[in-house]
Structure formats: C-alpha cells, structure tokens
C-alpha cells in the first residue's frame, strides 16, 4: 500500500490484487492516520476488478458519506452501468481529484 498526501486529499494505491487484504489493512488507517481526510483509492492496476470486489468498499464509502468526506475509487476495468450509485468510481486519477476539488 502506498499513501500520498495532497492538500485536500490523500491517495492510497493498492500494490497487489488481493483486495480483501487491502481493505483489511486500510480500515485501521481510516480510524487514525486517514481520519478526516478526503480519500482517493487508486485501483488502476487491478484490471480484473469485479462488482464483488467493489462492494468490499461499501462500508468505508458509507462511513465517509456520514462524515461528510469524499471517498472516490479509481478503476477503469469496471462497467460504469453496473456500478451502485452509493460508491463513486471514476476511470482516471484526474477525474477523482476534480471530484474532490
């Protein structure tokens, strides 16, 4: 996992294709280090991402909405028409940054 802080947001990049483990490792960071930060999850390297994988982030996305913070996932492998409206997914990092700013 690679974390890059910017002025208005933090980008967390997943380094492996084990999304269950990534979410498991991410959750403690969300409670402390990344608390109160707008968050971009960079999953561009995951070319086999499925809707099932995306739903691993549902609880995190919901918590960010309650906290009035942005939570955006970046992945271009998913079909935009099959995505739940509750989770924001964009195909590029630039679009994710634009959504937060």
Where is each model-derived feature located?
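Short acidic-hydrophobic, aromatic-tinged amphipathic segments that line or gate anion-handling sites
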Residues: 88-96
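Short aromatic-glycine-(Arg/Gly/Cys) micro-motifs in beta-strand/loop hairpins
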Residues: 6, 61-83
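Conserved beta-strand segments of the P-loop GTPase G domain that flank and frequently precede/overlap
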Residues: 12-14, 39-44, 73-74
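Short, glycine-/small-residue-enriched flexible loop/hinge segments at domain edges that mediate gating
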Residues: 23-54
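A charged, well-structured terminal subsegment
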Residues: 97-101
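STAS-typified acidic loop motif
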Residues: 1-28
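Short, solvent-exposed loop/turn segments at secondary-structure boundaries
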Residues: 51-53, 84-87
């Amino acid at each position: 996992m690679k974390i890059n802080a910017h002025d208005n947001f933090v980008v967390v990049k997943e380094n492996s294709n084990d999304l269950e483990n990534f979410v498991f490792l991410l959750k403690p960071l969300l409670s402390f280090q990344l608390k109160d930060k707008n968050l971009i999850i960079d999953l561009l390297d995951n070319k086999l991402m499925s809707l099932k994988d995306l739903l691993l982030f549902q609880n995190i996305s919901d918590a960010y909405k309650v906290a009035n913070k942005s939570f955006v996932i970046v992945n271009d492998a998913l079909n935009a028409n099959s995505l739940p409206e509750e989770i924001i997914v964009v195909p590029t990092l630039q679009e994710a940054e634009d959504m937060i700013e």
